[in-house]
């Protein structure tokens, strides 16, 4: 059973890095009028932001995989799996949007994935309450990060905006689930370290 689980997660990891994701929900579409034409500068900026979001979803897959593998609770395994499936939708959506913008995912995705997997294992080994607290804090920081992107995206890029808005709604839900399941609040130094690591990732992934 454990071996089968490892094989499944290994396959998911390879697909995350390679950009071959399974979409269980369709790409969110803007409710309003047809998308407007973006200038070259707007397309470049939108692509940079969506590349950052794609990297975030690569990391989310690694984190949830690690947390799922390190918990002995069947209920938490199911919760992490459900969140990972929704995050895989995000991965597929952002990859789809990058292609529409004639851009590409980060060249450093294997590095981001490996780092997030290691962090997830450490969080999981510290116990379920810490692991859930880490999940809740991660989702809070992602929510804030997506709020920033919603204000930065070109006004005409309603397609990217629709994707980010649905991603944000899902992240809020995941964070609440982690808190409701018993996640503790992480100490301030840990939260600050997470923000610093996120800053390095986002500033690098925008370009690479």
Curated annotation (Swiss-Prot):
Positions bound to Fe cation 1: 57, 87, 90, 171
Pfam family, one: COQ7
PANTHER family, alphabetized: 5-DEMETHOXYUBIQUINONE HYDROXYLASE, MITOCHONDRIAL, COENZYME Q10 BIOSYNTHESIS PROTEIN 7
Cofactor annotation remark: Binds 2 iron ions per subunit.
GO molecular-function term, one example from the UniProt record: 3-demethoxyubiquinol 3-hydroxylase activity
Example of a GO biological process term: ubiquinone biosynthetic process
Cofactor(s) needed for function: Fe cation
CDD domains registered for this protein in UniProt: DMQH (cd01042)
Lineage top rank: taxon: Bacteria
GO CC field: plasma membrane
Keyword hit for Transmembrane: no
The family this protein is said to belong to: Belongs to the COQ7 family.
InterPro entries: COQ7_proteobact, Ferritin-like, Ferritin-like_SF, Ubq_synth_Coq7
EC number: 1.14.99.60
Membrane topology recorded in Swiss-Prot or TrEMBL: Peripheral membrane protein
Gene: coq7
Catalysed reactions, as listed in the record: a 5-methoxy-2-methyl-3-(all-trans-polyprenyl)benzene-1,4-diol + AH2 + O2 = a 3-demethylubiquinol + A + H2O
Protein name per UniProt: 3-demethoxyubiquinol 3-hydroxylase
Residues bound to Fe cation 2: 87, 139, 171, 174
Location(s), subcellular: Cell membrane
Record's keyword terms, sorted: Cell membrane, Iron, Membrane, Metal-binding, Monooxygenase, Oxidoreductase, Ubiquinone biosynthesis
UniProt function note: Catalyzes the hydroxylation of 2-nonaprenyl-3-methyl-6-methoxy-1,4-benzoquinol during ubiquinone biosynthesis.
Associated pathway: Cofactor biosynthesis; ubiquinone biosynthesis
